[in-house]
Amino acid sequence: MNELIKHKLELLPDSPGCYLHKDKNGTIIYVGKAKNLKNRVRSYFHGSHNTKTELLVSEIEDFEYIVTTSNTEALLLEINLIQENMPKYNIRLKDDKSYPYIKITNERYPRLMITRQVKKSDGTYFGPYPDSGAATEIKRLLDRLFPFKKCTNPANKVCFYYHLGQCNAHTVCQTNKAYWDSLREDVKQFLNGKDNKIVNGLTEKMKSAAMTMEFERAAEYRDLIEAISLLRTKQRVIHQDMKDRDVFGYFVDKGWMCVQVFFVRNGKLIQRDVNMFPYYNEPEEDFLTYIGQFYQDTKHFLPKEVFIPQDIDAKSVETIVGCKIVKPQRGEKKQLVNLAIKNARVSLQQKFDLLEKDIRKTHGAIENLGNLLNIPKPVRIEAFDNSNIQGTSPVAAMVVFVNGKPSKKDYRKFKIKTVIGPDDYASMREVIHRRYSRVLKDGLTPPDLIVIDGGQGQVNIARDVIENQLGLAIPIAGLQKNDKHQTHELLFGDPLEVVELPRNSEEFFLLHRIQDEVHRFAITFHRQLRSKNSFSSKLDGITGLGPKRKQLLMKHFKSLPNIQKADIEDIIMCGIPRTVAESLRDSLNDPPK
């Protein structure tokens, strides 16, 4: 488990939602749902697991989550996210037709039915539902509440359900199109959670039946009311109109703005985009700028309509974007915008919590390091490393960490000037002298601690330069690596001693990072220099090819093989005379003698 995951686990909410595990490349490898995100996601990184789960956990380098308002929403969102991303560790779900919908047919006497195929022209659809059991349970309740056609009898012959008040598909009922349209709308309102009208009606019927001593009928009404209270299903992540739309929500705090975009395709929320950035104008103005840039990016498909929050001017967005802009006022559409806003708030808060934790962690690390070495808190640390291969192109590098963070503007590179051959001690002496002579000469602020990537010999050389030659008093520590080239020991004191440093401590991680960074910086510089020297040596001796022209070739072609493959005209285009270009080609392409 890496440090990022450790921090994120501490900040997870107790809300329901979906989580997305990612690998080192940022690819989503698993999507899951949870009643409680905090408990579920943490469970992956604690305790024992079966072989399959352990394999999944071994690949997790990061995770994201989307907060929902119910477990049902989380389940349906999970389905959509799996279908969209096809994570390799998820069971391969079938396509949309495998999920059941409840349908009201467009017949003269409409029927309620369960189907797995959606054809918008032949009915009104509700769903999809997680499984056939859930759809069947809801349909049974709808059958008891709404008198759609339930029989195969001809219209002039009433059925058993008619006598129960559950089927009005008969001529004796004198129903018309307006009646069925009204009933269809009642079902839609009911499934969207607006069930007060029906519950109130059932409550009155229950009371009336009890007053007339019809206790069995009253019990039926009571059971219906209880069934409705258990249902209360609000599927904000699904829309019945099957439209493509983008839903924007944003939240601002502490000078930062977070914008969340939900991508709804064919009525289903399948993906989200999150962006956080500092804002400098009014939030509404910066949001308009953001949404304009968002759709300038060709990877973002422009949908039929875009949902935006209430405080944004729709006409301004429409002018920028060029499609229908909607500010939902009520119902599930407004709830979806609110969900985007809620997730924007959660994401921004997580960013602040991570920053605060990181600050506490790095401040704690440098404070603990100071206490461990019995020196003032080392706010500024300068670290050095040498790099050469058998004495060729010897270089050194310095990296700087301020308050536990790399300060790259202060990094420095050194070409070794006075040392011939592979001599790490002499190279270290030269570099330390050059660096801190400049500090004295220019009145620069000296570091609170110098770290040498090396053992006792290099540290003693550095101390001799600092104390005896330059008269400075700067603490110097050494970092030794083991056979696997990993940070192993911290050397400090006079005489030098190994300082016990717990491997799981924040100060150890800080020193490990410093050592890795200075080594990386030195190696990179050395490779660049070797490549440049190799390039130049091959071009030496070619008449008319001086340092400036070599530099032009290096800048344009990057490597000798590229020059060898280039046409004469390409070389001339760099500002090289034709005669020199021809000599160059002949020289590079002649076989060695």
From Swiss-Prot:
PROSITE patterns: GIY_YIG, UVR, UVRC. One of its GO terms (cellular component) is excinuclease repair complex. It comes from the Bacteria. It holds the Pfam family UvrC_RNaseH. Keywords: Cytoplasm, DNA damage, DNA excision, DNA repair, Excision nuclease, SOS response. Interacts with UvrB in an incision complex. This is UvrABC system protein C. It comes from Streptococcus agalactiae serotype Ia (strain ATCC 27591 / A909 / CDC SS700). The gene is uvrC.
